[in-house]
A protein has these predicted regions:
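Alpha/beta-hydrolase-fold enzymes
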Residues: 4-108, 119, 229-263
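Short acidic (Asp/Glu) and glycine-rich catalytic loops that position anionic groups and cofactors
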Residues: 87-94, 139-141, 200-205
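Mobile cap/lid helix-loop segments that gate and shape the active-site cleft of serine hydrolases
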Residues: 97-134, 141-142
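Catalytic histidine neighborhood in serine/cysteine hydrolases
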Residues: 112, 162, 166-203
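Short beta-strand/loop motif that positions the catalytic acidic residue
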Residues: 139, 145-147, 151
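Conserved alpha/beta-hydrolase "acid-adjacent" motif
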Residues: 152-158
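A conserved mid-domain beta-alpha-beta active-site/ligand-binding segment of alpha/beta enzyme cores
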Residues: 201-217, 221-225
């Protein structure tokens, strides 16, 4: 999203009124444990392997993230299912999480080098996307930035770092739990807490922000909903039919074949 907005800004286009970043890395200075595994040799190997073509298998990507929390996401099921013969209980979030997708090899190689290795997105003009030089200083629009306190993929400090990069009016909110459960937290469940800091105050260190933030019970969704109302257009009636005109007809009932297809 950040690179798409930067491309549009470079072309003088501003079709977006506001943007929301959920557990997102833009500044890759703090990438947590993943930083241990990504160095020049690893990236060069991936560039040689698939930089000109091919795919990164979705299962390989899923395994990488699972082994960042091996006790919960790997060995827990080895012991319970393989050793004890227990059937894992249904878990909607993990079912969704297991639906991985393949990545184009050239994109994956580009991403590794320009983000995790060289952190080029925060260096004006260093990275190029769709023929345009990326300069996030031009992405001057209201943004809502959410980070999860126990996130093992996007550390809270990494999510917070976006407040130091994006120039527009910002709101940063921290939620309890991790990368997925922190985000998917419907208010009706009345679970967990979220933290909100002073309006417009973003010290450089995330720990300083946390020290002064106010803890509020329940989901952060209610805060986000109010923020969106202030940046959205007028409400309009929902369309009565699917598709749009003769050119964009509905293909089949939701959710569609692509949702059920395996990578």
């Amino acid at each position: 999203l950040s690179t798409a907005l930067a491309v549009l800004a470079a072309r003088g286009e501003k079709p977006v009124a506001s943007a929301t970043f959920l557990t997102t890395l833009i500044d890759f200075t703090d990438t947590g444990i993943l930083d241990v595994f990504i160095d020049e040799n690893f990236v060069k190997f991936r560039e040689m392997q698939m930089g000109k073509g091919g795919l990164l298998k979705g299962q390989d990507l899923a395994s990488t993230f699972s082994f960042l929390r091996p006790n919960d996401l790997v060995w827990n099921y080895v012991v319970g299912n393989y050793l004890k013969g227990e059937t894992p209980p249904p878990f909607d979030l993990l079912y969704w999480n297991s639906d991985s997708t393949n990545l184009p090899g050239p994109f994956y190689a580009w991403y590794l080098r320009n983000t995790y290795l060289e952190n080029n997105l925060v260096k004006p003009g260093k990275a190029r996307v769709c023929g345009e030089k990326i300069d996030l200083r031009q992405v001057d629009l209201p943004v809502y930035i959410y980070g999860s306190r126990e996130d093992h993929i996007v550390p809270i400090g990494g999510a917070y770092a976006s407040t130091q990069v994006l120039p527009g009016k910002k709101r940063f909110v921290m939620g309890a739990s991790g990368h997925i459960a922190g985000v998917i937290n419907p208010p009706a469940a009345k679970k967990r807490s979220h933290w909100i800091g002073a309006e417009g105050k973003f010290p450089k260190d995330v720990n300083d922000w946390i020290a002064s933030a106010q803890e509020l019970p329940g989901s952060w969704w209610t805060d986000w909903s109010q923020w969106l109302k202030g940046h959205a257009g007028k409400q309009i009636p929902a369309p009565k039919g699917y598709g749009k005109g003769a050119k964009f007809k509905a293909i089949e009932p939701a959710p569609g074949r692509y949702v059920k297809a395996k990578a």
